[in-house]
Regions:
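Single, function-defining residue in the core of a domain
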Residues: 1-22, 26, 53-55, 62-66, ...
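Major-groove recognition helix of helix-turn-helix-like DNA-binding domains
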Residues: 36-57, 65
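Long amphipathic N-terminal alpha/beta scaffold segment
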Residues: 71-82, 98
Length: 354
């Protein structure tokens, strides 16, 4: 049996409801059609507000990771550009702006409020394996201190994760990293590596270095690999450090280019679902809305993966929004959204979603 609170919040995202009134009225309008969702009646406005304020957001976090365990393997895509076989994770954070007068706990700047979603995205499935929701004022590297570390995997991140004590811990755990380094990085070159002929136009530098700043060197005394590439699309040089010395420079460059996938994930969850504005003002309510958005996008990516039709995620969300209370054979609709479904056999019963 599904929780009415979970069903309400999933409806909030699928229907892009802007208030508890919209959620309650929307579900009430589906009288008789809620049984397949695992609830008997639509919750009231006060019930939704109370549950969002009092029910521990970690319950929804647990639901997300349980579903990820069950459905995550289905969402994995075949690698095309990346030739390495190790696990790849993309690390970044995104800010969600809030009105400080309404969300006074969400400190960010003097007159601005925000929460920050620190995220470790699994590359093949494009789904988070770690999310830490904090106040907007928490630095990116601090929000990533407890990310899971998988030996032999590689973590790709931007310059905000130039935290040498943290990188030293990753290295000690057998984790590779590809990090864009800051422009003011102080280092000494130990050895210039030969540039590949085919990559000479985009790969500008491949060298082994040690940090020369005494404080930084104390935090990360081992040698590093530094690769500089030319980003022709944005007309800029990108300089990266890594602790992997066996991959081709072109592999390190391609790994960093794939970091864009986490930006796409953040764009999708903000534009397609409902986390730009919030139906509750407490920290718990905000976290519940974010975790249920993650549950929703996991369900969407699973549906996309089992469909024969080549859905774009945005189109799938739009079609579900238009047909949210239409009784359909889900698999048939996913496979052939523009065809009339066959007539349901007698004594046919709709399955339970949860």
């Amino acid at each position: 049996m599904a929780s009415p609170n979970l069903v309400s919040m999933l409806f909030c995202h699928f229907a892009k409801s802007t208030s508890v009134r919209d959620i309650s009225n929307g579900l009430r309008s589906a009288t008789g059609n809620l049984n397949h969702l695992g609830i008997k009646t639509a919750p009231s406005k006060s019930s939704i507000s109370y549950q969002n304020g009092k029910r521990d957001a970690d319950l929804f976090k647990d639901v997300y990771f349980k579903l990820l365990e069950q459905l995550g393997q289905h969402t994995k895509e075949r690698r095309i550009k990346l030739k390495i076989k190790v696990s790849v994770y993309l690390l970044d954070s995104t800010l969600i702006s809030l009105c400080l007068s309404l969300f006074d706990w969400a400190t960010y700047r003097t007159k601005k409020g925000a929460v920050k979603m620190h995220t470790l995205l699994e590359y093949d499935g494009k789904l988070p394996v770690y999310v830490n929701i904090t106040k907007g004022s928490v630095a990116d590297n601090k929000g990533a201190e407890n990310i899971p570390l998988e030996k032999g995997a590689v973590i790709v991140a931007d310059r905000f994760y130039n935290d040498f004590p943290m990188l030293s811990i990753w290295d000690s755990k057998g984790v590779f990293f590809v990090i864009r380094h800051k422009e003011n990085l102080k280092f000494e070159t130990l050895q210039e590596r030969e540039l590949p002929p085919k990559g000479a136009q985009s790969i500008l530098k491949d060298e082994e270095i040690v940090l020369s700043n005494p404080l930084s060197k104390e935090k990360y005394p081992k040698k590093l690999r530094r690769v500089a590439i030319w980003d022709n699309e944005n007309k800029q040089t990108i300089e990266m450090i890594s602790n992997n010395f066996s991959w081709a420079a072109s592999t390190i460059a391609e790994l960093y280019k794939q970091r864009w996938q986490i930006e796409i994930f953040f764009r999708d969850i903000k534009q397609l679902l409902h986390i730009k504005t919030f139906i509750g003002t407490s920290e718990n309510a905000v976290k519940i809305q974010i975790w249920t958005a993650l549950i929703t996008i996991l369900i969407l990516k699973y549906l996309k993966s089992i469909a024969k039709y080549n859905w774009q995620l945005s189109n799938l969300v739009a079609f579900i929004r238009l047909n949210i209370f239409v009784k359909i054979n889900l698999q048939f609709w996913l496979d052939k959204p523009f065809e009339q479904p066959p007539e349901a056999p007698k004594n046919y019963y709709q399955g339970v979603l949860f």
